[in-house]
């Protein structure tokens, strides 16, 4: 029996459509049914990850396993933002563990909704992605240092994220770690963080693509119509892909840019732009 809260496997049916062939769920995670939102691309399955709880609480330990078999194509997003609630006892925290495997010719677009770090929240997140050399990946996350609309800002305890991408033989392709302090952050009043508190991270892996050309497109903030965004990109070791980090004053700006970035990648591979994703 799976020890994960959500265990998903996807494969292609005889028509070439991506379907869910295995699904095991326990509270509080659920998976939506498959949506076919693009009539020009019946191969791609559009899925929502649903958390039926109010959010992450002290002591929560959520695990998700996602396996894409050969030739599958998946767009996965959350139904709503991930709220990390107060954990005033310094010995408590919440944990999330994500394990992903993407086989040859498969494609994963994982566009997460924002993680909102409430006052006194503490979250540790690990993401492990095993990627075939002929697999494609678009991965994004957004981090909010509080309920900004309420004036809550950097009152959380800490956020720790560790991400690792390996080959199918477990050779490390890329490793990244973010340790973001909240209350104890000595830089939170600096102009950079005060003016642009919304943080986003993006990873793009496109085999056999010209990463220099793609990087130039993704850094074109005029074309993205996001002139106020701060953005930096770098090519991953051994030309495995691209890492981008962005800062913005508001969440809609970041979401707008992520959509632009995903459409750039789609256009590069002769796919239609992202259809409307209802939330």
UniProtKB/Swiss-Prot annotation:
Cite the entry's keywords alphabetically: Chaperone, Cytoplasm, Nickel insertion
Its main localization is: cytoplasm
Location(s) in or outside the cell? Cytoplasm
**What are the GO MF terms of this UniProt record?**
nickel cation binding
Pfam families given in the database record: UreD
The answer on whether this UniProt entry bears the keyword Metal-binding reads: no
* Family annotation (InterPro entries): UreD
The UniProt entry's GO CC annotations, sorted and at most eight, read: cytoplasm
Q: Which domain of life is it from?
A: Bacteria
Q: What does this protein do?
A: Required for maturation of urease via the functional incorporation of the urease nickel metallocenter.
Family membership, please give it. Belongs to the UreD family.
The record describes its quaternary structure and partners as: UreD, UreF and UreG form a complex that acts as a GTP-hydrolysis-dependent molecular chaperone, activating the urease apoprotein by helping to assemble the nickel containing metallocenter of UreC. The UreE protein probably delivers the nickel.
- Protein name (database record): Urease accessory protein UreD
What is the organism field in this record? Answer: Trichodesmium erythraeum (strain IMS101)
Kindly list the organism's lineage.
Bacteria, Bacillati, Cyanobacteriota, Cyanophyceae, Oscillatoriophycideae
